Amino acid sequence: MNQVSDRLAAMSPSATLAMSQKSSELKAQGVDVINLSVGEPDFTTPTHIKEAAKKAIDDNFSFYSPVTGYATLRNVICQKLKKENNLEFTPDQIVCSNGAKQSVCNVILSIISKGDEVIVPAPYWVSYIEMVKLAEGTNVIVEAGLDQNFKITAEQLEKAITPKTKGLILCSPSNPTGAVYSKSELEALAKVIEKHPNIIVIADEIYEHINYVGKHESIAQ
């Protein structure tokens, strides 16, 4: 008897975590391994972050928080978006969650219904397509190879859109390629999206400060 749901059965294990597990097993056997799988820092948590976490416990931040996050945090996020990205948002437009992975998954589960299509530029982070599967959506993979610096074009985006298209996942700077979309490239993509108001752009910009190519621009700008 199958004990899991069809949604879970349709998903694939994370290749990243599988590689990390294999690395740990080899290290335990005494093998010298360089682990390039998971994106973990090569340093421990900075002291000021540890102290802030300890202080939060001492200050009794151990009860249920507001669903959208603490107001003070949402205010600071708005200030960051204004200062660093020149984007105007109010705290009421901000929802906090436990990291980028949960944020992206929450959005996908909130907007994607069975049969909805989500455009995913490739190469892509392995978890994107699994999140769409979990929402019972359909992944539409758009290949962007080395010849185009791993970035999809406006023409490719337009061609991939169908009446079932509900979302576009756009990661810049990109995981895993490091590719960064320029302002003009984002504007070209935005012009395509503007013609299809039912499509929601899921902009994963978690790596905006890990950028070795050029200036980070947000499609929200």
For each feature predicted by the language model, list its residue ranges:
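Structural signature of beta-strand start/N-cap positions in the alpha/beta core
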Residues: 32, 117, 138, 166-167, ...
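Short acidic capping loops at alpha-helix termini that bridge into adjacent secondary structure
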Residues: 88-94, 114-117, 164
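Short beta->alpha connector loops at strand-helix junctions that form conserved
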Residues: 122, 141-145
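A short helix-loop-beta submotif of the ANL/AMP-binding
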Residues: 134-140
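Active-site phosphate-binding strand-loop segment of PLP-dependent enzymes
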Residues: 146-217
